């Protein structure tokens, strides 16, 4: 299998997960993050069985379970009487082969960042604000504000809701 040099714009949940999966497959990966340090804001996040299979593939299942919860069901009640009006089960682990879990977004981000850095301590390059990219005959060049460009075979845009990569593509 050919080894690719893969550039990832963004060190959020998607970028870190993609990086770890690609490194596990034997590729050279570099993540470029605009922030001066890694940190994730937000509240709770749900990890469905499908996503949990990916976390298991990365070997971080135990860390997720230690920091998260596995709710049994969603229960909807009337506010004034407490009467249950709807209930649906979330614990269908036997059916899907993995649990449904919930944890704090920052905890998931920390776990994913640790996993990526275990594979390559220098995988995340901070203070790299992406300004765009250029497709070349042999790959792609990722451009930054106040930094030299870098070249790779493949570019993954995981740079968030205000994605510079996506905006240039569409």
Regions found by a protein language model. Give the residues of each.
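Conserved N-terminal helical subregion
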Residues: 2-6, 48, 52-170
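Conserved hydrophobic helix-helix packing surfaces used for dimerization/oligomerization
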Residues: 6-8, 29
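Active-site-adjacent beta-strand anchor residues
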Residues: 9, 41, 102
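Glycine-rich NAD(P) Rossmann-fold beta1-alpha1 loop
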Residues: 12
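N-terminal Rossmann-fold NAD(P) dinucleotide-binding loop
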Residues: 15-16
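Glycine-rich FAD pyrophosphate-binding loop
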Residues: 23-43
